[in-house]
């Protein structure tokens, strides 16, 4: 393991075969975990899913994984027949719901696999690798560091950094408004782009310029819309300052940034399928190309 610094039409997938080489030649997003805070299995979350944050971008023959919530376990299991493999993992931040799937990510235990792991320098100034490992391995899980047999390479990022992968894949970063900080990502390839902004809270006096600039003209904006406006401002239990936003603010940002499609993401654990269906109707009434993030849903990007 090493730490380095880098240079500056929704389709359900539950009954679909595992991704083919042709899939990897294009640009698609697949959702593996769409919840916030805590996994929520049960009868009320069957249609949207109960795993915490994890999504995969397959672009130009490469796998880019964003966040490692409990959805990462299922993603890892789906890759079991494709080893050895190389992939890139990007973390927005290190709260539990974005890292708790890593100790159950089977490919990390397999010799011959290689993972390039990117994340922000922690607020306390310690190395990203140390900060990450201490949270996902012993004593917080029974897994010792030596159990991870894959080649893990760590790269530290600062908000505003950008990097180039092979085949013309560009990745840009931006600061998000979240306790202990978080980082948003924009992935661009052949003029098509996806922006991933989770977790982030809108500002009280206008749009967040960091998110706005990162999102301008994107084909798809995946946005933290954990609450409704009514929940966010509820005088009995306000959510102001908790680091999350609303679907109404997602629409405002999408319209201001001129994005083509917005995905409502990071669903509250109390929001069951019927509640999310109702949000979908409301958001599509004002932004027809909006979608609700669902586990195992695949979204083609541009094209």
Residue positions per predicted region:
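Binuclear metal-dependent hydrolase catalytic cores
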Residues: 2-195, 206, 211, 277-303
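Cap/insert and terminal regions of metallo-dependent hydrolase folds
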Residues: 201-295
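DG-centered beta-turn motif at the end of beta-strands
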Residues: 197-199
